[in-house]
Amino acid sequence: MGVPPAGVVVAATKPHRRSICSPKNRFCSMALVTERVRYIGRKLKKVFRCESRVTQEKSSISDGERINSSNMKKRSSLHALRAVALTLPGLAQATDGDPSTFTFQYGRYEEGKRELFDTKNDEFDPIVVDSIFGNVSLNFLDRFKFSGNYTQDTWSGATPITTAPLQFMFDTPTGASSFAATNVFVDADFDPVDTSVFTPSGLLKDTQLVHMVTSASVETRKQGDFGLTYEWDEAAATVGGGLSSESDYESHFVNIGGSLDFNSKLTTVDFGMSYTWSDIDVNLDPRFDPYIDEGNHGDDVEISIVDGNRVTSVTGKRRDWSANLGLTQVLNKNALIESSIGYTRSSGFLENAYKVVGFLFVEPMPGMPFLSGNFDGVLEQRPDVRNQWVWDNRLVHYVEPLDASVHADYRLYHDDWGITAHTLELDWNQPLGRGWTVIPRVRYYSQNEADFYQPFFLFKQAKPLLTPGRPDIDFSQVPISEYSSDHRLSGFGTLSGGITIAKQIGDAVSLKAGFEYYTHQGGLKLGGGGEDDFADFDYWAANASLTVDLSAKFLPVLSSSSNDHFGLHRHRGHSGGHAPAGVMFSHMLPSAGDFMVGYRYMRSERHGDILHGTGSVSDATIISQGCGNVQCSFAPRQMIMNMHMLDIMYAPTDWLNLVLMPQFVDMEMDLRPLPGQSLDVGEHQHGGNSTHETGGVGDTGLYALIKLFETPGHHLHMALGGTAPTGDVAQTSIREEHPPLGAAGTVEEFVHYGMQNGSGTWDFRPSLTYTGQGGAFSWGGQLSGIIRLDHRNDSGFAFGDEFKSTLWTSYNLFSWLSASVRMVYTRQGEIRGEYDGPHSEIGPMDFPESYGGEYWDLGLGLSSMIPFSGFEGNRLAFEWIQPLNDDVNGFQLEREGSLIASWSISY
């Protein structure tokens, strides 16, 4: 499958490949079809195979990026063909039967530096996106399938907002003041000119263009969606929906679809429809707002005063209707072909509110060698309706002598904005034996520019003024009504190459890792005539994923029956029953060769009063005492932290377990201004946006669990290991300054200490765990600690050491369900050192002494061993942590509580 034009958002349900084979079908072993559903530019994919069908959905981290994945198992040439055919890009393996699966994927997208010609724009880091994706696909009641997905993208870095002649940039940090220039100079051909000592006139033509870029604080997008499918013998129907939310854009979507099989299931027809409704609410960058004319957007623009500052907001609504029709045909035992057409109609606010267009007004004066004009910035204006058509084609062919398959894709895209795009892609899927598969690929993409795109717009007329003596443009006198300088609507081509490596581990677990490198160039446009080379850049994308077949044969699980002495059989490593969800390293795998995969989620919240010691304090106390020698101007209103962690455990012996625990975090802090404080020069201004966000890869845990003692009903083991500093501790935010004279400015500085993604230090995290069980009761205790092995991290500080102790007991309510109660004591030291770079000191959260303390908590939990057929061996556990007492260092926001959920399965 190809990719749409960069910057083109296609909200469409796009089915592709589905085929279900009858037992009498001689091509059954290789027939295959996939449905692909695209929600707002993110790809959700489904795979079906002959004896059974499995759905696996995936979200790409960005338009134009896709990491292929595959899993194959060689049995015979026909079985190999089937497996090879199933290795479609981005999709998990379909296994025998009708399996339920769990998938977790991490992806990273990173752009290279752009050519900014030594302007101060070059100081900005390029775009980086960290993405996580989770999917659970469950089969139930024989013919039903449920698929749920969660996607999270965290963005940071600088992106172009417009294009301007280099000579208009004035070497400013963002280029914004280019639009404040009352006079710019062009020659008789209306080309920009530069000063020169080598020409008699002192001016020299210079047509070089350059991107204006701007950087923003970290932002996170979260999306959840679901699908429910019912299957008949020769048909299927699906309904689904979801929500995508970020700080300035929220979308809801629903879809319906179906498929019909004909010709002994050698032919499949797919069809579907979707509807998306979106709300846009953007606060314009205060660095650009004073220079940008928003008058062309009328009622979409609202100006308000927040915290004493002017805030310009752009709001709008968008609607997308989509329909599609697809056909899959099995040609012979070695090949199948797929083709589909899709249509999307988008209406409403289709602009990107962050994109600016340069208007150059020059009044012609015949006979003059040089002319002066005005260069003004306006918000882009796109058509209110967009009609889009897509035609996708794919050929899958099994190459029997090499036990491999080739996938060839072509996509044609066209819309009524004047963009036509072509995508060619070629994948080679090669099994290597022992569960290994390698998939190299190459992709070429080309599009022409939109009808209303130009790097900037030249008008051979005097600047039309709405009111004499004021700079506002009279847009009724501008000869065009639609215009954009968004480089994603320009003419360009991309060429990419990549590789995916997949490994099947037993019958239940598959691992994949992929990498793809892209080059984006105007010169690669089909037929030439693309954007000039100032817009060229490279980027890369990589991901890694783990997929677990939930219906595979797993280890026997802990029995909770009183008829089983101490509840012990093969899974004896769980002596003492299952600990609450929040207890790490609570058990060991019992036998050499055992393997466990788990997922853990934690959400913790802080809001309410500001505490000092054990009591709450007033705002007046915070102002006078919370920020050292200066007065505080802000205090935290709320902080939310989400953590996603994988638990991967392997037992090389019956007394030693090895554990890998990668984690991914995101945090959000909302601030409130303190009463009576001056928010003028040099203070921290949010311009209406008082929320900071961070997120990405956290620290990675590596541990060894060692069994010390075990008898029936009692078990003791210790954990030795710790975390590697893979989490970023250089997360920054943009501080806006509003001096009384001059334009708004910004400073990029370290975000509040508690919002960094990791510790930045190598941390030793030992623990000692005891568990026991008698009858329906089980109990346990754990001592654990964190010792920072580095005195400072790369940002100049180190979090305090930590000691924790916990005791719990649980009772079996049923043979499959237990309830637990837990007490937790934690002591954490304050931060050592401080940031060694720019950082705010506007509130208590910015001072190292306001971290750490002593905490008492109560945990209430439920743990279940799933009793349903097809899900045996799966454990689900939940625990709520309720704070009982806080004795904090410095001034800290009150803790509200934490929710912990975990899932695990062993085989």
List the model feature ranges, each with a label:
Residues 106-112, 152-156, 232-234, 241-247, ...:
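Transmembrane beta-strands of outer-membrane beta-barrel pores
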Residues 135-137, 225-227, 257-259, 322-326, ...:
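Outer-membrane beta-barrel architecture
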Residues 115, 151-211, 215-224, 268-334, ...:
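Outer-membrane beta-barrel translocator/channel fold
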Residues 114-120, 159-165, 241-244, 249-257, ...:
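Outer-membrane beta-barrel translocator domains and adjoining extracellular loop/strand segments
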Residues 194, 198-204, 340, 344-398, ...:
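Outer membrane beta-barrel transmembrane domains
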Residues 97, 111-115, 120-229, 564-728, ...:
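Transmembrane beta-barrel domains of Gram-negative outer membranes and organellar outer membranes
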Residues 117-123, 210-214, 240-245, 255-259, ...:
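Extracellular loop and loop/strand-boundary signature of outer-membrane beta-barrel proteins
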Residues 100, 144-146, 234-239, 265-269, ...:
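Repeated loop/turn-to-beta-strand initiation elements of outer-membrane beta-barrel proteins
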